[in-house]
Structures are given as structure tokens and as C-alpha cells.
Amino acid sequence: MTLDLSTFAREKGVKYFMISYTDLFGGQRAKLVPAEAIADMQKGGAGFAGFATWFDLTPAHPDLFALPDASAVIQLPWKKDVAWVAADCIMDDAPVEQAPRVVLKKLVAEAAQEGLRVKTGVEPEFFLISPDGSKISDTFDTAEKPCYDQQAIMRRYDVIAEICDYMLELGWKPYQNDHEDANGQFEMNWEYDDALRTADKHSFFKFMVKSIAEKHGLRATFMPKPFKGLTGNGCHCHISVWDLAGEVNAFADNKAEFGLSAEGRHFLGGIMKHASALAAVTNPTVNSYKRINAPRTISGATWAPNSVTWTGNNRTHMVRVPGPGRFELRLPDGAVNPYLLQAIIIAAGLSGVRSKADPGRHYDIDMYKDGHKVTDAPKLPLNLLDALREYNRDEELQEALGREFSAAYLKLKQGEWNTYCSQFTEWEHQTTLDV
């Protein structure tokens, strides 16, 4: 039975709803709707000019309506009179096929048709920086190896604990928070869930972290590589596939190598097969490739892959199998669109299951030290343009995510690359002025 948002508002004391959708570039767009008007919005959606956000639309297109999904409503723990609700984009009474949440829902349904239920957990890393974005906010956070630094995390206790308390209140079951490998960097973990719910939570988490940071006079950034020489922001994703009831893990086989079943290996095989094209979505910005192709950081490791390899419990590879019944994709970064991340994982994984793809040999080596000895594993794209070209060549992935989505994404991202190439940098000035 669909939750009535008007009733929800009366029972919870909600005065306003943020009807929110995510555009192709991961931007979160919303309208603040008074509770008195939510009944009409729940029926027909809140109207937007789609061209004003990152979609391949024109000013001549009719209104884009964001139809709230009442099952995804979240009352803001820090502002109880407001509730956030994820929305699906429609136009002329039909789903907008290029909208990320629409794309994900289609792939979740496809997996269900094959008796599969994808569950995932994400690990979005972020920096707490100065309001102007120029430096790390904690001037004492200067250690060469700051990971798990207890003094540093306690200096940011007020921010981290407040966010964690809110996740506890929301029933997300958070289980750990830590200072990460870069100065000023943090990670907060909560329990895995169905792919769509994970995407909704991921989207809300970014909104919540930024909001609470601002409340404390700080700024939070999920930018993949905000500071030269420091470890970048990853968004590792743990993946498992279950039966439709969510009771039997189809990836688990304690007798198999790494505890990964044949079906799990096939799903992983799809990820490996499509990895270079995946990067166009999992690493969607120019800056993303400063993380996955970075030189050694001050702390000693980038903690990011640069080759298409997998292994057991070893964090130097693109895919890690830390235990039976799941694997971790370490490729995505903090700029990834929460919905497209889940969508492209399902698309690639289903491709592997259908074709019984083999993930290939695994390498039990330190890729940071000995990766140069591996000659039969593809390198990940060197830049956004290379990744877009890989996606453009991957007909199977384009078909799986939808031709309308793929065309729109490639067009807008190519435009972003062209804009980047038109920039005149200080490096050019310094290195070329006197030639």
C-alpha cells in the first residue's frame, strides 16, 4: 500500500517536502513544497524546466515532472519540519528514459525477471574543508599517515557523531566511522540494502553530510581528487546477489575459491568485461582520472586501481573479494552518480550472468609494487575522453542502460570534456611562454 504523504506530514509534523531528483551529472535538484500541496504533487509531480538542469533537453520541451516515491521519504533528522523524498522524472505522462533513477529502476526490474535481487553497500569518502574550498579545515591534521588517527577524528567528533546519530535515528544501521588515508578525509559506513534503496540513501547521505558540515561552518567535498599529493575520494561498492526473497545469497559458495559461486563469478566476469566502459560512469569527471592514475601519495598509496584486475582480500586491485558471497568494486569515486553507479553495475553483471562470462585469472600480487609485471590485463582509461570512447564502443552496455540515456550522457559529457579542453591553464603559461 502506497504511503499517503499528506498523512505522513500530519503524523510527523512535517511542514515542507523536498521533492528531489538527480540529473545526469549527479546534481540534486529539488522543489520545496508545503505539506498542504503535497497531495497534488503525489498524484502528478512537481514541475521543472528540464533544460535548466543536466539533461539533454531544450527550452522547448514540455515540463519535466518529478513524481515523489513515497516509499523513499525521509524526515530530516536535523530539521524535523522538512522531509526529503526521492522522485522519478516523467514527461508527457511517460518516464524520462535518460533520468538516472528511471534507468536504475528498469535494471532492477530486469534482474527481478531473472529471479535476482541485487544488494549493495557503498563507502563514500569525503573531505571536511574550509568554506572557500582552498584547504583542509583542521590545521592540526598534518600527519604523513593520518589514516585512523584518533586525535584527528575526535577533533571532528561534533560533525561525525551528529551525522552518525542521524543515521541511527533513520534505521540505517551504521557500524563504523573513521578518519581516512588523507588529511581531512573521512568515511562512514552503514548496512547494505537493495540497490535502489542504497542509491536513495547514498543520494541523501551526500545531502546530509554537506548540510551538517555547513551547519558547523565547514564544507564537505566528495570531489575525487581535491588536493594534489593526498589520497582521493573513493566510493567503493560491495555487491551481492540474492534470490527474490532476499534470503539466499546466490554469490555464496563456501566450497568455491574465495567463497564466490559460479553465478558470482559470471556476474564478476561481466564487470571485468565492461570495466573500461564502466569508468565513464563510475569515474565521471575530468578530475576522476587524477585519482585512478595518480602517482604515489604522501601516505604511501593511492588506494585506487589503474588496471582491470581482481583478487581475494587485497586492496590494490580493481575488484577485491573480501569474503564469501560478495565482492568489492574499488573503481568508483566520490563524483559518481548514486543511481547510475548501481545501474551500470547491474547492467554489466547481468551481461556476465547471461553470457556465463569468465572473470579471467586473478593476481595475488601487490599491484602498486608489481603491477608493471602484469602484461595481459587492460589498463583503465587515462582520462575522461578515453572512458567516453570506451562507453561509446560498448554497444551491449548502451543497450542495457538505454539508448536515450546513453546518447544523452555521451553528448553532455563530451561537452564537459570540450569545455575542459578550452581552459587556459597556468601550467601552459609557465611551460610554454618562453619557447
Curated annotation (Swiss-Prot):
Q: How does this protein's activity vary with temperature? A: Optimum temperature is 50 degrees Celsius.
| Occurrences of domain GS beta-grasp (ranges) | 12-94
So what EC number does this one have? 6.3.1.2
Q: Where does Mg(2+) 1 bind?
A: 123, 236, 328
- Report activity regulation: Inhibited by methionine sulfoximine, ADP and pyrophosphate, but not by various nitrogen-containing metabolites that inhibit other GS enzymes.
- Quick one: which residues bind ATP? 240, 315, 320
Q: Where along this sequence does the record place binding of Mg(2+) 2? A: 125, 180, 187
* Cofactors demanded by this protein: Mg(2+)
Principal EC category: ligase
Q: What does this protein do?
A: Catalyzes the ATP-dependent biosynthesis of glutamine from glutamate and ammonia.
Subunit note: Homooctamer.
Protein name per Swiss-Prot or TrEMBL: Glutamine synthetase
Biological source species: Rhizobium meliloti (strain 1021)
State the organism's lineage.
Bacteria, Pseudomonadati, Pseudomonadota, Alphaproteobacteria, Hyphomicrobiales
